[in-house]
Regions:
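Aromatic, loop-rich ligand-recognition surfaces of beta-strand-rich domains
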Residues: 372, 388-468, 476-533
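Short coil-to-beta strand junction motifs in C2/discoidin
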Residues: 261-268, 327-331, 444-453, 508-509
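Aromatic- and Gly/Pro-enriched helix-to-coil junctions and flexible linker segments
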Residues: 36-201, 309, 317-366, 520-530, ...
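Short beta-strand-plus-loop segments that form exposed binding edges in beta-rich domains
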Residues: 315-327, 496-505
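N-terminal secretory signal peptides that target proteins for export/translocation
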Residues: 1-17
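Bacterial N-terminal signal peptides
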Residues: 21-32
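Sequence context surrounding c-type heme c attachment/ligation sites in exported
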Residues: 35-102, 304-308, 725, 740-885, ...
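Extended surface/linker regions that mediate inter-domain or inter-protein docking
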Residues: 111, 135-140, 162-293, 299-317, ...
Length: 953
């Protein structure tokens, strides 16, 4: 039996495994059936309107655009989506041609819908990874995002809610693993760790080329703003803290703004693996941004998830003091305090929620204040002796945890005679397994140890034979381990330097850090177990049954309940602790098809309605309000509308906003392109962090405040902070906090098109491609139906600074007939956005890279020169525009098309399937003739009610 098979069989009874496999097989069969096209209504007479309005261009003789509508209508089924979209949005017939009346157009659309090829899609689908994680977290009272541990399975589908995404064996195995991790976090077998608290005021050593941008003061450490030579944000690492366990931690930075700096200073707080120099950086993740405005020291707090091995580092951003050496102004940090792992309440919500109504045995919360860190030698009560020392470079520096300070043998006024050595005292005869050595950093290397010999002694004067000897690396600054062949408990060890680097031939020696290697000390952490006062089988059964109703609806399948209870009972019978048995039973529920597959939408079934609404709007399970309402019976339209609007106001709807907007607009791929620092040297991690947040917050505001749909095209508001406002050239916004900002009517900003996130990700990081941007506007915002580009036509990437202008290059490309039709639609949108560079900043001239010699070294002025003036004019559907503002005015004339496309993509996200042509007719009918007054929430609600109540799919 394989390991995986053994895992399955030991965790689930055979019947449950069979049902899981049967479900996967059933979904697969449905998927196979989806490829069998169903012919629409045969024998439908083709409306005369097609002959009247279409056949001049699309009969068999003409077939303009390779569309022979005459033959297509004679031989159904057909893929009529392109023709349908042109017809329903008014793109066809062309504006200069006679137009069908409303009734005739409706007849034509209905006929195309009837003839459209259809696919049988599964009526249910598997949960997306975000839906699974949020659902389990909400059920258990957790806040622990493990979505990255689950495969997306999205592939090339637009949304991860697509019903064609199937459950697979790797996905199920990942679900099992993640479920275990979440249940263990909710009900840890060892108990909950005591909260520990640390304080650090020391920096870990950094390269000398960056240390000069910090200055120790009586109050703390003063930082100026610097960037590494490669352009990355250079972070200074704090010492004396490393999280012992994964969990949530509170990080408090006591700091102030010092000196003449006009705006707030931003402190970026990172976590990641420590690195010494920027030539070997390690991945860092941004935990949060703090804003310093006061000249008085104040506490600034953030919460973040940390893991063992993480090191806290900070990067201080203030544009006025870039690379000021030995700074007099900047961010002054007195100390950093950390506490954790945190629990949201005591007792934790996972227990108080799961065992609501049952008494718990809850110990008093333990808080441990951690002592200042010690070296291993200090911890065992040891000490050091040295053969000699130079004043200011004493032996204590080998035990201060900072490798840029060091011990050095005496070299003036006279050079100490060899041998040079260090004696390590072990008064309590602790078992030693080796030594830890670090060279000193930041200097010329003079005195660094090349070879060594180690001897042991019982009295500190008579030394035995060598117990270890060898070479040390003098090239790199890192900790090196010297392991003994056998552990030793001698009270004295002598580390003799037998050869050292010398620049002038004198006999000298130096060491940055030297410590002993000992067995791990007993864990200092205390664990606190919480469990119900009554751990009987009846309590176990009641808790599992109640959980099942919350997770699966009020009427979960009886056989699933029985399987869950049987597994929990078996665990208890085997002598497992109560919480272990509970986790086994809950895992059965959470890994069952009933939980992992979305319910079939049934407007007459209250629990199904509640589950579907919660999944769409919260990516989770229903709350008590929704459950209570749906228990009374099916929701009518007004009740459903009220619940949708209520749920949009709930903070949990931000999950939907992030998911929907990220996939629809492409923000999920925001990190794939980074602007070139040669062309756009002002682009930094702070800007990169906040750009997508502007778009997410803007879209959430439109939905919650029911602002009109035209805000997508142009708006007088956005969400900015100091860094974004500076990037956009907007005055009066101070501080790192994102807030709603009223835009000046003369501003170039407003709406999605001019947001830096959109402008950045629709380029290659160097050039602003009108083709890429135009295609994005055409597809994501306008919904223009476009066929794929011909395979034989090469991709065009325009370049500035050539003899041919940008537009001339594109026009030459589009002379090919195969390219002209699409580029006629997409290129004008891109031309209108040419006043924005690849970082999203306004410009009036193009930049071209200026050659430089040697390796790239970051500099604020970059490596570019100015080239041609920007031309942001164009022609859209026969109407000319001169800039982005006049192009927006033309787009607002096509607002009904924008609203219709938004309705389609929201329908797709909510239902898990693209709307059929019949459904598109219904969606289009929701858009009023004057859509400028159509609220975003109103439209979303209409579409969602249609999804929920249309049981014809």
């Amino acid at each position: 039996m394989s390991t995986q098979s053994a895992f399955f069989s030991s965790t689930y009874p055979r019947g449950l495994i069979t049902r899981l496999c049967g479900l996967a097989w059933m979904v697969w069969m449905l998927w196979e059936g989806a490829h069998k096209m169903l012919q629409g209504a045969e024998g439908n007479q083709v409306p005369e309107a097609f002959q009247t309005f279409c056949m001049d261009c699309h009969d068999s003789d003409t077939a303009k655009g390779n569309l022979d509508l005459e033959q297509a209508l004679k031989h159904p089924p057909l893929d009529a989506s392109l023709a349908f979209e042109q017809l329903i949005t008014g793109g066809m017939p062309p504006a200069e041609k006679p137009q069908p009346g409303p009734m005739e157009r409706h007849q034509m659309l209905t006929h195309l819908a009837n003839r459209q090829t259809q696919m049988n899609l599964p009526s249910s689908r598997r949960l997306s990874r975000q839906e699974f994680i949020h659902s389990v977290n909400d059920l258990l009272g957790l806040d622990w995002d493990l979505s990255e541990a689950l495969p997306t399975g999205k592939g090339t589908f637009l949304f991860d809610s697509d019903r064609r995404i199937l459950p697979t064996e790797p996905w199920m195995a990942a679900v099992f693993h993640v479920t275990d991790r979440l249940l263990n976090r909710a009900f840890p077998s060892k108990g909950f760790p005591a909260e520990q608290r640390w304080v650090t005021q020391r920096l870990r050593h950094s390269h000398d080329s960056y240390d000069i941008y910090t200055r120790p003061t009586e109050e703390g450490i003063l930082f100026s703003w610097t960037r590494a030579n490669n352009g990355n944000s250079y972070s200074f690492f704090y010492d004396d803290f490393e999280p012992p366990l994964s969990g949530w931690y509170e990080i408090q930075v006591e700091a102030k703004k010092q000196g003449a700096i006009e705006r707030d200073i931003s402190i970026e707080v990172y976590a990641g693996k420590y690195y010494f120099a920027d030539d070997r950086p390690q991945p860092q993740r941004l935990l949060g941004v703090l804003s310093l405005s006061s000249p008085e020291i104040q506490p600034h707090t953030l919460r973040a998830r940390l893991h063992p091995g993480d090191q806290i580092s900070i990067h201080c951003y203030a544009e006025e003091n870039f690379r000021e050496q030995d700074p007099e102004r900047g961010a002054l940090i007195r100390k950093i305090s950390i506490r954790g792992p945190l629990v949201n309440t005591w007792p934790p919500t996972s227990l108080s929620k799961t065992f609501a109504g049952f008494p718990l045995k809850v110990p008093e919360r333990i808080i441990q204040t951690m002592p200042p860190p010690q070296t291993h030698l200090q911890a065992i009560g040891g000490g050091l002796q040295v053969s000699s020392f130079q004043e200011g470079m004493e032996k204590e520096y080998m035990q201060d945890g900072i490798a840029r300070t060091f011990w050095h043998s005496r070299f003036k006024p006279e050079v100490a005679s060899p041998p040079h050595f260090v004696i390590l005292e072990n008064p309590h005869r602790q078992i030693l397994r080796g030594l830890l050595y670090s060279t000193w950093t930041g200097g010329n290397g003079n005195g660094q140890v090349k070879t060594y010999r180690i001897q042991a002694s019982e009295n500190g004067s008579e030394w035995g034979p060598s117990i270890a000897e060898g070479d040390l690396d003098v090239q790199l600054a890192h900790e090196q381990t010297i392991a003994f062949k056998e552990p030793i408990d001698s009270p004295f060890l002598r580390f003799e330097i037998t050869d050292a680097l010398s620049l002038d031939g004198r006999s000298i020696a130096s060491i940055g850090e030297l410590d002993v290697l000992v067995d791990e000390a007993p864990e200092e952490r205390q664990w606190q177990i919480i469990e119900p006062a009554d751990t009987s089988v009846s309590v176990l059964q009641e808790v599992i049954l109640r959980f099942a109703k919350r997770a699966l609806g009020n009427d979960p399948a009886q056989e699933l309940i029985e399987a869950s209870l049987a597994i929990a009972q078996r665990s208890m019978d085997q002598g497992d602790p109560f919480l272990t048995a509970l986790k086994a039973g809950l895992k059965t529920l959470l890994c069952s098809p009933s939980f992992l597959m979305t319910p079939v939408i049934d407007p007459q079934d209250g629990p199904s309605t509640a589950s579907t609404l919660a999944r769409i709007l919260w990516l989770s399970v229903p709350d008590d309000v929704l459950i209570e309402m749906t228990q009374r019976g099916p929701l009518n339209r007004e009740d459903m509308r009220g619940q949708i609007l209520r749920m949009l106001q709930d903070a949990r709807s931000q999950r939907m906003v992030r998911s929907f907007v990220g996939q629809w607009l492409g923000l999920d791929g925001f990190d794939q392109v980074t602007p070139s620092l040669k062309l756009y040297p002002a682009y930094d991690t702070l800007l990169h962090h906040f750009l997508p947040k502007e778009t997410e917050m803007f879209m959430a505001h439109l939905m919650r405040e029911n602002l009109t749909i035209d805000h997508l095209i142009d708006s007088d508001i956005s969400f900015l902070n100091q860094r974004l406002a500076r990037h956009y050239g907007i005055e009066g916004v101070v501080g790192a906090q994102m807030r709603r900002v009223r835009l000046d009517p003369a501003s170039h900003r407003g709406g999605l098109l001019t947001m830096g996130s959109i402008l950045k990700m629709t380029t290659d990081g160097f050039e602003s491609s009108p083709i890429r941007r135009g295609a994005w506007v055409s597809k994501q915002l306008m919904g223009n139906p476009l066929p794929p580009p011909p395979p034989s036509v090469p991709t065009l990437e325009p370049h500035h600074g050539l003899e041919a202008s940008l537009k001339e290059q594109i026009n030459q490309h589009t002379q090919q007939a195969a390219c002209r039709a699409c580029h006629k639609i997409i290129d004008p949108y891109g031309f209108g956005l040419e006043s924005f560079d690849a970082s999203g900043q306004w410009r009036e001239r193009y930049r071209v890279i200026q050659p430089h010699s040697g390796t790239f070294q970051y500099r604020p002025e970059g490596y570019y020169q100015w080239a041609d003036p920007v031309d942001a004019s164009g022609t859209l559907q026969g109407q000319s525009f001169r800039d982005i503002q006049s192009m927006k005015a033309l787009l607002r004339q096509d607002l009904k098309k924008v609203a219709y496309h938004f309705a389609k993509v929201w329908f797709h996200y909510a239902s898990g399937a693209e709307p059929t042509l019949h459904e598109r007719i219904a969606l289009h009918a929701m858009i009023p003739e004057d859509p400028s007054r159509l609220g975003m929430a109103d439209l979303m609600t209409k579409v969602l009610i249609h999804v929920m109540r249309d049981d014809t799919r």
